[in-house]
């Protein structure tokens, strides 16, 4: 089982799909990384040679993935909250950030319904 960017890639899958298990790597990024590394997309993860693994690791070094990407996203959200922007306020209050309606929906973001004492149907 190959370990790339701190992630154990699943056995038996094509390498282009296995790379998508890394946070920050989708199918398009995986294809670009494999093209830069000179590794065919249809090769299975089990069939990778150590040289191919090293080439993939080297090509992935130029892409922000895993911890670095998570840290950057969290810092961006913290920055929005600190400067008091509309988006930052929505993050702070736990409400949808991108303009969704909150009158009826948004249960995922708002959490479980709070029951109101004394309210009749």
Curated annotation (Swiss-Prot):
Keywords: Ribonucleoprotein, Ribosomal protein, RNA-binding, rRNA-binding, tRNA-binding. It comes from Lacticaseibacillus paracasei (strain ATCC 334 / BCRC 17002 / CCUG 31169 / CIP 107868 / KCTC 3260 / NRRL B-441). Located at the top of the head of the 30S subunit, it contacts several helices of the 16S rRNA. In the 70S ribosome it contacts the 23S rRNA (bridge B1a) and protein L5 of the 50S subunit (bridge B1b), connecting the 2 subunits; these bridges are implicated in subunit movement. Contacts the tRNAs in the A and P-sites. Pfam families: Ribosomal_S13. This is Small ribosomal subunit protein uS13. HAMAP family: Ribosomal_uS13. GO terms for cellular component: cytosol; small ribosomal subunit. One of its GO terms (molecular function) is tRNA binding. Residues 91-121 are annotated as: Disordered. InterPro entries: Rbsml_uS13_C, Ribosomal_uS13, Ribosomal_uS13-like_H2TH, Ribosomal_uS13_bac-type, Ribosomal_uS13_CS. The lineage of its organism: Bacteria, Bacillati, Bacillota, Bacilli, Lactobacillales.
């Amino acid at each position: 089982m190959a370990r790339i960017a701190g992630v154990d890639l699943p056995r038996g899958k094509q390498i282009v799909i296995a790379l998508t298990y890394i946070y920050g790597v989708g199918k398009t990024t995986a294809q670009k990384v494999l093209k830069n590394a000179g590794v065919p997309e249809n090769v299975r993860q089990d069939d990778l040679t150590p040289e191919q693994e090293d080439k993939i690791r080297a090509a992935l070094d130029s892409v922000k993935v895993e911890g670095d990407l998570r840290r950057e996203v969290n810092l961006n959200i913290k920055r929005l909250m600190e400067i008091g922007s509309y988006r930052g306020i929505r993050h702070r209050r736990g409400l949808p950030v991108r303009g969704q309606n909150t009158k009826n929906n948004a249960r995922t973001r708002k959490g479980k319904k709070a029951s109101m004492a004394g309210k009749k149907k």
